């Protein structure tokens, strides 16, 4: 299978550094290793503006990052990162979010939902749905007043995006 240069570089670096299998590590260690891997990757486009904020959820709050492209945005995208429900955060996925903002011409709001095992199901789903509701009601804060709203994600985040879209349709 053909892999792009960034993926090939990341895999070579992991092999060279003998990166452990994340599934064999306790969650805290897996999170640290995953973050180290991501810090070694090239950053995303720097012409994308970044602003962090807090979203209230179920008596707590979660972080979110608003990424605004230099060009005029055509949509407001809420993005849920992957990580097997256990690892990953908006810092680890910053480059991904920046690329999405630029290439999709979207204001991207990355949501740092709470993760297992500390926060088991349905906490991540509820966090993401609360984030969707908050972002929709506070479009002026995130900069997407008149833009169509879409949800997206990768891996566990793709699952969350699907569940949230269905729940929003049904409620």
What are these regions (language model features)?
Residues 76, 105-107, 148:
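Structural signature of beta-strand start/N-cap positions in the alpha/beta core
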Residues 130-171:
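Primarily recognizes the serine-hydrolase "nucleophile elbow" in alpha/beta-hydrolase
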Residues 1-66:
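A glycine/proline-hinged amphipathic helix-loop "lid/cap" segment
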Residues 74-83:
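Short beta-strand element of the alpha/beta-hydrolase
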Residues 112-116:
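Short beta-to-alpha linker loops that shape the active-site pocket of alpha/beta-hydrolase fold enzymes
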Residues 90-111:
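Short amphipathic alpha-helix adjacent to the substrate-entry channel of hydrolases
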Residues 89-91, 119-121:
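Conserved catalytic-core motifs of eukaryotic protein kinase domains, centered on the activation segment
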